[in-house]
Amino acid sequence: MSAFIVLGAQWGDEGKGKMTDYLAENADVVVRFQGGNNAGHTVVVGEKEYKLHLIPSGILYNDKLNVIGNGVVLDPKALFEEINYLESLGVEITPDRLIISDRAHVIMPYHRVLDGIKERARGNKDIGTTGKGIGPSYTDKMERSGIRVCDLIHKEVFEENLKETLEVKNKIITEVFGGEALDYNEIYNEYLGYAEKLRPFVKDISVIVNKKIKDGKEVLFEGAQGTLLDIDYGTYPYVTSSSTIAGGVCIGAGVGPTAITNAVGIAKAYTTRVGKGPFPTELLDSTGDWVREKGHEFGVTTGRARRCGWLDLVILKTSARISGLTSFAVTKIDTLAGLDTLKVCTGYRLNGEIIDYVPASLEDLAKCEPIYEEFEGWDDSIANARCYEDLPENAIKYLKKIEDFTETKVSIVSVGPKRDQTMMISEI
């Protein structure tokens, strides 16, 4: 393969960072194609733990080109904080190792302010935003009033755009929401400083990435969030503001669909989600608490406790269909060791009918009753398993059920957070 995608097959937090890090060993280029610093990836290398939000996971290798695509919304302050954090851990970051699309949109201070104000105004109908300005930045992109990286690094263009945009945003902040106006000079001077620091990293990434593919280089596209958080196919409105599925790669990195050869869906061996929204297999009992504690299910970006539930194969089948997944990588199967009985959802009962897809209507999904198939658990810790044959028989049966139901093979299994706790079962 020369170009493949790694994306979340559930509600995010599936272990994409670890899987990208694992697969990046054989890649030449790693590309982030959507989202912003609302994403959180944890990668463990040896005894060191790295927490990434914006920068692609390939940065932990010395010989990879890392790309932030045009589909990403870029917070310069967050970017340079992350660069400083990584450099403090000994990771070198230079324009030879990291490039940023000139077409990426920039998150501005008013985006963060509006994100918080609007969320508070929703009251008990809040959607669980991270408050980092992601949604408002994508809104400006679609309204054609956003500021792109290429605008930011051209002083005159930035000055004019900021004046026009800030005038409108301040009216909304003060007159609609009763907030305090933002100071033009303060923002202008702060972002001019970012512009100079960004300039060496800024490129037309579509040209570079397509040339790498044409030259036969291995290109890995790294997704953020997950399929059920996609702006179109997720549990709307409890979704993110970008396209998290395979189709998002084409618009978020400037490559054609025929360039993509494989798509790997990352899925936990159980299901989690953060924030509000329907969750058919949610466990609201001691088993859910046990899984949360054993799996350390707390958000990298927000610190929020994740809701936990049984594995939902309807969701995985939907993800495989929407993104044309060629295989799954299953993570955290080690977390389930110790449970006597495991359940997997193989369908929903909705208004007396059995369905095997995720309905678009939030109201319908909330009514869905999960139909379960039970499996015997396993007592053995499998953290030391290094090949498929090391896994308990019941764990293998569990993985086989995923393959049979979704009609998609499981190519990778993870039994812990470290690189060497990963086994490749088949080619992806």
UniProtKB/Swiss-Prot annotation:
<feature type="active site" description="Proton donor">
    <location>
        <position position="41"/>
    </location>
</feature>
<dbReference type="GO" id="GO:0004019">
    <property type="term" value="F:adenylosuccinate synthase activity"/>
</dbReference>
<feature type="binding site">
    <location>
        <position position="306"/>
    </location>
    <ligand>
        <name>GTP</name>
    </ligand>
</feature>
<feature type="binding site" description="in other chain">
    <location>
        <begin position="38"/>
        <end position="41"/>
    </location>
    <ligand>
        <name>IMP</name>
    </ligand>
</feature>
<feature type="binding site" description="in other chain">
    <location>
        <position position="240"/>
    </location>
    <ligand>
        <name>IMP</name>
    </ligand>
</feature>
<comment type="function">
    <text>Plays an important role in the de novo pathway of purine nucleotide biosynthesis. Catalyzes the first committed step in the biosynthesis of AMP from IMP.</text>
</comment>
<feature type="binding site" description="in other chain">
    <location>
        <position position="304"/>
    </location>
    <ligand>
        <name>IMP</name>
    </ligand>
</feature>
<dbReference type="InterPro" id="IPR001114">
    <property type="entry name" value="Adenylosuccinate_synthetase"/>
</dbReference>
<feature type="binding site">
    <location>
        <position position="144"/>
    </location>
    <ligand>
        <name>IMP</name>
    </ligand>
</feature>
<dbReference type="Pfam" id="PF00709">
    <property type="entry name" value="Adenylsucc_synt"/>
</dbReference>
<dbReference type="InterPro" id="IPR042109">
    <property type="entry name" value="Adenylosuccinate_synth_dom1"/>
</dbReference>
<dbReference type="GO" id="GO:0044208">
    <property type="term" value="P:'de novo' AMP biosynthetic process"/>
</dbReference>
<feature type="binding site">
    <location>
        <begin position="332"/>
        <end position="334"/>
    </location>
    <ligand>
        <name>GTP</name>
    </ligand>
</feature>
<dbReference type="InterPro" id="IPR018220">
    <property type="entry name" value="Adenylosuccin_syn_GTP-bd"/>
</dbReference>
<dbReference type="InterPro" id="IPR042111">
    <property type="entry name" value="Adenylosuccinate_synth_dom3"/>
</dbReference>
<dbReference type="GO" id="GO:0046040">
    <property type="term" value="P:IMP metabolic process"/>
</dbReference>
<comment type="pathway">
    <text>Purine metabolism; AMP biosynthesis via de novo pathway; AMP from IMP: step 1/2.</text>
</comment>
<feature type="binding site">
    <location>
        <begin position="40"/>
        <end position="42"/>
    </location>
    <ligand>
        <name>GTP</name>
    </ligand>
</feature>
<dbReference type="GO" id="GO:0005737">
    <property type="term" value="C:cytoplasm"/>
</dbReference>
<dbReference type="InterPro" id="IPR033128">
    <property type="entry name" value="Adenylosuccin_syn_Lys_AS"/>
</dbReference>
<keyword id="KW-0658">Purine biosynthesis</keyword>
<keyword id="KW-0342">GTP-binding</keyword>
<keyword id="KW-0547">Nucleotide-binding</keyword>
<keyword id="KW-0479">Metal-binding</keyword>
<dbReference type="GO" id="GO:0005525">
    <property type="term" value="F:GTP binding"/>
</dbReference>
<keyword id="KW-0963">Cytoplasm</keyword>
<feature type="binding site" description="in other chain">
    <location>
        <position position="225"/>
    </location>
    <ligand>
        <name>IMP</name>
    </ligand>
</feature>
<feature type="binding site">
    <location>
        <position position="13"/>
    </location>
    <ligand>
        <name>Mg(2+)</name>
    </ligand>
</feature>
<keyword id="KW-0436">Ligase</keyword>
<feature type="binding site">
    <location>
        <begin position="414"/>
        <end position="416"/>
    </location>
    <ligand>
        <name>GTP</name>
    </ligand>
</feature>
<feature type="binding site" description="in other chain">
    <location>
        <position position="130"/>
    </location>
    <ligand>
        <name>IMP</name>
    </ligand>
</feature>
<comment type="subunit">
    <text>Homodimer.</text>
</comment>
<protein>
    <recommendedName>
        <fullName>Adenylosuccinate synthetase</fullName>
        <ecNumber>6.3.4.4</ecNumber>
    </recommendedName>
</protein>
<keyword id="KW-0460">Magnesium</keyword>
<feature type="binding site">
    <location>
        <position position="40"/>
    </location>
    <ligand>
        <name>Mg(2+)</name>
    </ligand>
</feature>
<dbReference type="GO" id="GO:0000287">
    <property type="term" value="F:magnesium ion binding"/>
</dbReference>
<dbReference type="InterPro" id="IPR027417">
    <property type="entry name" value="P-loop_NTPase"/>
</dbReference>
<feature type="binding site">
    <location>
        <begin position="300"/>
        <end position="306"/>
    </location>
    <ligand>
        <name>substrate</name>
    </ligand>
</feature>
<feature type="binding site">
    <location>
        <begin position="12"/>
        <end position="18"/>
    </location>
    <ligand>
        <name>GTP</name>
    </ligand>
</feature>
<dbReference type="InterPro" id="IPR042110">
    <property type="entry name" value="Adenylosuccinate_synth_dom2"/>
</dbReference>
<comment type="similarity">
    <text>Belongs to the adenylosuccinate synthetase family.</text>
</comment>
<feature type="binding site" description="in other chain">
    <location>
        <begin position="13"/>
        <end position="16"/>
    </location>
    <ligand>
        <name>IMP</name>
    </ligand>
</feature>
